[in-house]
């Protein structure tokens, strides 16, 4: 490829609405241009990287035995109504009517469509296992699209769906996809972690997320530096304390805490550790034809509520936060001073595991400007229902017993789920087993965000000059920058020869023959992020040298002109081999 025949749309400034590095650099490098909120054109530079991501994903899907197909972006509402997600999915599902007043959606995912394929095409256990995959455009009507391709409305995704006759088969399909994802993200050249996760709106039982590690990541990941444990903070278990609960040492006492509604302020006023205070969170669940059930969730003052964990507790699947009026009606006080002692109406109390192990703690007195100190279980309060309802913290014991938890940020780029029979049951996807009896198919689903990978890779690989692509997904692997290509026969002949040698070796090379000044050439290709650069000039050629600089190198080095192609080829192949 020669630059004069390619489109290079670099910009000096990022748009005002670009908040994070990847969005700024993708626009400045000429990879994307905004069409509407969360919807982008992918310009030639961006599309080249997308195609390289797709190629790696396809190779590993095929290697794992998955079979490619293509399903429509537009899906009939009937399929979503069958699965129950027509109501569940909410406004993120873009719905529309055709000219005949039929309801349709633009698919954010394809479980319904692929289940429809399976129930019509798979009749016998002999046809399984089977794993279908596609690379297709999706649409999710985000309320606030932002961060460029990281949270867009239209995006490109690889989604795969496995169908098995039994749990053993599903486990094997899941393992194959998990292993394929490890290979994919390794080949992409990204630092990543596979973490245990919650299944969210997709549903199902067992799942893992694949996160690219980056400081700008939206998700918090709990991991153990001395073991393989890693989990999304939403799913990471907070272990109960090993030590036995201490015996009461204080009498229960009502204390004045004027204007101190927060645990931190109460701890400071009473000169006690924050860890001795209780954070009281009030939830409500509806009862048809009756007043709601009110729940008091008790956390240690320095801990945070994990709503995902709470929603999995019996009776709390559809919980909401109580209104201020409900709090006053049940506790006799507005938020900030409430607690489990002396409520106006009965409430259901759930104590976090850590709270259940506490003694002599401080709670709200259900009276403005007052708290109660020296509270103890069994003496002042009945023993509570106990559950893990908090986020883990740095320093907590690792659930695998092999060290302590640390926290990092991650960008989710892949997710694998064991769905079981969730969609098969809802949509009647059955097969005949060995005895001729109908059984529901066991499903797994496996997604990779193709366009999101580009943003995540940039968040992990950039400097003040621009993007630093891993070789595997760079739009070009090497750029040739000839000094005076249009003026010097020596330079032009050497550049053309080097270009031909690299191309013959299978290297993705671009020759910048635009006639730009060196500073412009260098700035463009550093911004675009090409991993390797060779500079050809008359002075160097007279000495038999060509200048080489890797995108991560602080300084350039000189290579023998007749060895430059072989040297760079070896560097690229070595990088791609990892």
From Swiss-Prot:
Q: Which residues form the signal peptide?
A: none
* Catalyzed reactions per annotation: tRNA(Pro) + L-proline + ATP = L-prolyl-tRNA(Pro) + AMP + diphosphate
Q: Which GO terms describe its biological process?
A: prolyl-tRNA aminoacylation
What broad class of enzyme is this? ligase
Q: Where, per UniProt, does this protein localize?
A: Cytoplasm
Superkingdom of origin organism: Bacteria
What family, per the record?
Belongs to the class-II aminoacyl-tRNA synthetase family. ProS type 1 subfamily.
Designated name of the protein: Proline--tRNA ligase
The organism named in the record is Burkholderia ambifaria (strain ATCC BAA-244 / DSM 16087 / CCUG 44356 / LMG 19182 / AMMD)
Gene of this entry: proS
